[in-house]
């Protein structure tokens, strides 16, 4: 029972960590990455589809993304989705291929993005603490129902805290790595 609670908490903490990684991948650094645009939703074929289902996204140069739609009819819709996104990048297209030149970030924009990274890391830490709190409540319930002893409850609390600390360190590391990427010129 205790192991089930700890396993469930660990699984949820892994998901929270992965969600942070995925979110931070969409934050623009000075270098081109398909993750910047692959999540964008494009109005095509009467539905809203992610860009990575409509085109291949390549990085031929460090500051250039090339988007090659599978169907040339979707070029305008993809360009429009990029323009409407918060990326701040203007696409150029020749009717078949869309090119995104990734401009150098200004110092002010870098600091703004760093604050955004810190905020996302903090949100993820809050999610971890909520997961820990829910697991502690489950353990408390098990103890009240006399399914585990007080000693088992205390040991499980310590294991849960170690687990939480490990994931918090991982979040801090992910955040610091992304901040360094953003601040890199």
Curated annotation (Swiss-Prot):
UniProt entry keywords in alphabetical sequence: Cytoplasm, Protein biosynthesis
GO process annotations (BP): translational termination
Gene3D superfamilies attached to this UniProt entry: 3.30.1360.40, Ribosome-recycling factor
Taxonomy, superkingdom: Bacteria
KW Protein biosynthesis (keyword) present: yes
A GO MF label: ribosomal large subunit binding
GO cellular component, one term: cytoplasm
Record localization: Cytoplasm
Protein's UniProt keywords contain rRNA processing: no
CDD domains: RRF
Similarity remark: Belongs to the RRF family.
Function: Responsible for the release of ribosomes from messenger RNA at the termination of protein biosynthesis. May increase the efficiency of translation by recycling ribosomes from one round of translation to another.
Annotated protein name in UniProt: Ribosome-recycling factor
Organism: Roseiflexus sp. (strain RS-1)
């Amino acid at each position: 029972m205790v192991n089930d609670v700890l396993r469930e908490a660990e699984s949820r903490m892994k998901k929270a960590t992965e969600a942070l990684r995925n979110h931070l991948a969409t934050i623009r650094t000075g270098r081109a990455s398909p993750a910047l645009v692959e999540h964008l939703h494009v109005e095509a074929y009467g539905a809203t589809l992610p860009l990575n289902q409509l085109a291949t996204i390549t990085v031929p140069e460090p500051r250039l993304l090339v988007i090659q739609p599978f169907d040339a009819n979707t070029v305008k819709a993809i360009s429009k989705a990029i323009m409407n996104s918060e990326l701040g990048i203007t696409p150029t297209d020749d009717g078949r291929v869309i090119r995104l030149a990734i401009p150098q970030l200004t110092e002010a924009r870098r600091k703004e993005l760093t604050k955004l990274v810190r905020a996302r890391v903090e949100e993820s830490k809050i999610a971890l603490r909520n997961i820990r709190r829910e697991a502690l409540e489950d353990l408390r319930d098990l103890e009240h129902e006399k399914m585990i002893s007080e000693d088992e409850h205390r040991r499980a609390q310590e294991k849960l805290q170690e687990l939480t600390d490990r994931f918090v360190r991982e979040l801090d590391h992910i955040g610091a790595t992304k901040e360094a990427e953003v601040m890199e010129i």
